[in-house]
Amino acid sequence: MANKTILFNKHLESNAKMVDFHGWDMPLNYGSQIEEHNAVRQDAGMFDVSHMTVVDVIGNDACAFLRKLLANDVAKLKVPGKALYGGMLDENAGVIDDLITYYLTDTNYRVVVNSATREKDLAWIAKQSQGFDVTVTERPELAMIAVQGPNAKAKAAAVFSSDQNAAIEGMKPFFGKQAGSLFIATTGYTGEAGYEIIVPEDEAQAMWQALLDQGVKPCGLGARDTLRLEAGMNLYGLDMDETINPLAANMGWTIAWEPSDRDFIGRKALETLRDAGTDKLVGLVMEEKGVLRHDMPVFFTDSAGVEHQGVITSGTFSPTLGYSIAMARVPNSIGDTAEVEMRKKRVAVRVVAPNFVRNGKQAF
């Protein structure tokens, strides 16, 4: 029996096409994935992300524990509410999950992890917390709604109370703040401005309806995937997993190597991989007809004339750009051109940084 979020009936009211997503009944679209995608790029759209897992880490050792658990360093977080993206690695430097950590106080952090990895993540966090003075508490009674797009903040402001709007006024990107019953964060998975709003389940349906009444378009998993791929954001299970280290997943910027004596889980293995050199995750652009897809092989010839092969991890048609884009894991000797094998022939592609659209515009 699939899990249902508190907003399940609201999705049916909007004629959502529901699909199984890692054991959750979630909306794929509400009629037109392209229209939903464009709403987020041009106006405002919203996503039910209540399947995500909210975990509070509280205690005297909360900071020390998270500095051990995560490859990024929560000690960098000095201002209450500041958020940090990074990976949780195993001893071999494989990515168990990618997650966002919010610093609330020195003894209180909030972590949001993926739904597909929930049980594995919670078990790993519980195991690693042994010996630390921390309490790890999952918060299943909290729902989450992401409101994204150039007009998202203005439309959300019409739904928030005056006190809530005052609390978040001037909040910079990648912050979160408790404002009344809501935890409002300037984070997202689309490359647009907006909020991710953590809301008590008993208030979630009313908030969803209020956002609908403001003209915020409901968006499903289909648009969520094309938006995140345009923004060059990884999807766990496709672009990285426990067999992939973060350096090979365009997550090198999330690894805090300094201070050198911080012995985070996976550090030694990751240092060995770094020194040996790893594959890298790049962006591909194909302006010919056709769509780049997961698992298609990528070929290129290096400066010495040697052919190398990689693989597409995520691919789609980009509604914003009007042609196909992809992320691919390839040997790091790749230049600025390559070929992808599709329908038994090789098609030329451009190699770019894995960041295709930012704030509605081409980013490469």
Swiss-Prot record:
Metal-binding as UniProt keyword: no
Catalysed reactions, as listed in the record: N(6)-[(R)-S(8)-aminomethyldihydrolipoyl]-L-lysyl-[protein] + (6S)-5,6,7,8-tetrahydrofolate = N(6)-[(R)-dihydrolipoyl]-L-lysyl-[protein] + (6R)-5,10-methylene-5,6,7,8-tetrahydrofolate + NH4(+)
EC number(s) given by UniProt: 2.1.2.10
Cleaved signal peptide residues: none
GO MF terms, alphabetically ordered: aminomethyltransferase activity; transaminase activity
Keyword Signal applies: no
GO BP: any one term: glycine decarboxylation via glycine cleavage system
Disulfide bonds listed in the record: none
GO cellular component, one term: glycine cleavage complex
InterPro entries, alphabetized: GCS_T (IPR006223), GCS_T_bac (IPR022903), GCST_C (IPR013977), GCV_T_N (IPR006222), GcvT/YgfZ/DmdA (IPR028896), GcvT/YgfZ_C (IPR029043), TrmE/GcvT_dom1 (IPR027266)
Alphabetical list of SUPFAM superfamilies matching this protein: Aminomethyltransferase beta-barrel domain, Folate-binding domain
Entry keyword set: Aminotransferase, Transferase
Record text on subunit structure and interactions: The glycine cleavage system is composed of four proteins: P, T, L and H.
Function statement: The glycine cleavage system catalyzes the degradation of glycine.
Family: Belongs to the GcvT family.
Protein name: Aminomethyltransferase
Naturally occurring in which organism (per UniProt): Shewanella baltica (strain OS185)
